[in-house]
Every structure is written in C-alpha cells, then in structure tokens.
Amino acid sequence: MKVVAFERSLQGTGASRRLRNSGKTPGIVYGAGAETQLVELDHNALWHALKKEVFHSSILDLEVAGKSQQVLLRDVQYHPFRQLVLHVDFQRVDAKKKLHTKVPLHFLNQETNPAVKLSSAVISHVINEIEIECLPSALPEFLEVDLATIEAGHSVHAKDIKLPAGVTLVAHVEAENPVIAAATIPAGAIAEGEAAAAEGEGETPAA
C-alpha cells in the first residue's frame, strides 16, 4: 500500500497546531540506522487509510520527496473527542532483520460450529490480534483462526493457530499461550435445557 508524505522542517506544539489547522498531520519516520525524519501527511487521506485493516498490519511504501521507503505504522495519536489524527509514527523496515509486530486475527466457521447450532453455545473472541516475529517478506496481513470444531466449555489458544512458513509467535506469547477464543453455553440456555429435561421425565407414559 502506497502512502505519500512530505518533508517538514518545523517542529514543536505551535508548528504542529498550524499544520493541523491547514489539514495536515505531523509524523515521524525512524529506524533502520537512519536519522529520524519529520514528515507531514494529508489528514483526510490518512484518516481514510487508517480505517483499513491492511494499513495497520502490512508493510507500507512511504514516499517522501519522491523517494520510497518501506515502513510499518507503529503509533497513532487521536484527539480524545474530535475526528482528528494528532500524530503518526512510522518505523523503517530492514529486509534482513526480523520484525516484532501485531497482526489481526480473522475468525472462521463460527456460525457453522455444531456447538453453536445445536447446543446454543456462544463463542467469544478473547483477543483480536497477536504478536508475531518474522522477516518483512513473510509478514502476513492477518492470521486465520478456525472455530469449526471448538466444543462447548473448551477454548482455542495461541499455539493452536496455524502459522505461515517463516512466522513464529514472539517468545512471551509462546510461553503464556493465551486463550484466543472460548465457547460457553449461557446460563439461560442451560436452565431451559434442564427444564425441558425435567418436563420430559415428569410425563406419564400412555397406557
């Protein structure tokens, strides 16, 4: 995904405020052993780009002064109550060095899960993104979590995710193996099932 930015020379609260008033958003580009670069981006274009999942989870081609560099979006600061992006941070990508970054999880086959269809189970998504490690060339836009066979009372953990070649969970996620999704039967559904069973047991067989 291509992103266009422009060099800026002024920094500080006053300069940033003037930028925002003119429809621009200040940002920085850092990393890969190069100097930090001050940039500005068109606010409206940035606002719409930020609504796309791919903008947050993939390598971006950032063009500044006619030169393109590969970056990851690392931080976004929003105004607390206005639809306004205050600042963005981009990190340069080194093709030979592994990245530590978070990618979104896409949950599949929840609606067709037997526990959901037959037992009124509810599947909760405990986390919606997970931290991985890989070379830039192997970075996936998202990871899929198949919920087709999860049973009521059971859960899916981080280590259950099928990872693409060259992608691993970061060490602390691997060690903790957190719950990704869990299937439970609501108390109301359990009570209804017990009541129906009791009615069935209480019926007198026909002579």
UniProtKB/Swiss-Prot annotation:
One GO cellular component this record assigns the protein to is: cytosolic large ribosomal subunit
Keyword Glycosyltransferase annotated = no
- InterPro entries in the record: Rbsml_bL25/Gln-tRNA_synth_N, Ribosomal_bL25/Gln-tRNA_synth, Ribosomal_bL25_b-dom, Ribosomal_bL25_C, Ribosomal_bL25_long, Ribosomal_L25_dom, Ribosomal_uL5_bac-type
Keywords of this entry: Ribonucleoprotein, Ribosomal protein, RNA-binding, rRNA-binding
Pfam families found in the cross-reference section: Ribosomal_L25p, Ribosomal_TL5_C
A GO molecular-function descriptor: 5S rRNA binding
Cite a single GO BP annotation. translation
Q: Does the keyword Cell division apply?
A: no
Identification of the protein by name: Large ribosomal subunit protein bL25
